């Protein structure tokens, strides 16, 4: 199994589970107008450095100069009760609140009837799933940025994070 697109798409043996995807679209339906509004705003923004991507009609992504300013402007024009707007470096994301990684992990736990869930994440985008999991794995850099749940295994940064997790 692999959850991609912020948990909106489930791959089983490399193939997309269409029922999972359709359910994801239903879950975020109330956010659709805000996503479309963000696309319109970003398409007109001169700070944008990449076309605006509407990834699987689930969330919006682009790259911008001065991304913090872009996020601030979007937050003033879009309903932030329905969507999260943030940047990671020059990347700008608009993601329905209901399409969090934490919600995806909870859906997946029920889907496979898992008794125990272990997650690994390396950015602030991953924090919502840490509280859902029985065990979470994160790099030290994330532990210094925000408060992680007590059950989080914090890895030293000696190697590439994915290699540390697999060991």
Task: Give the role of each language-model region.
Residues 49-55, 84-87:
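Short beta-strand
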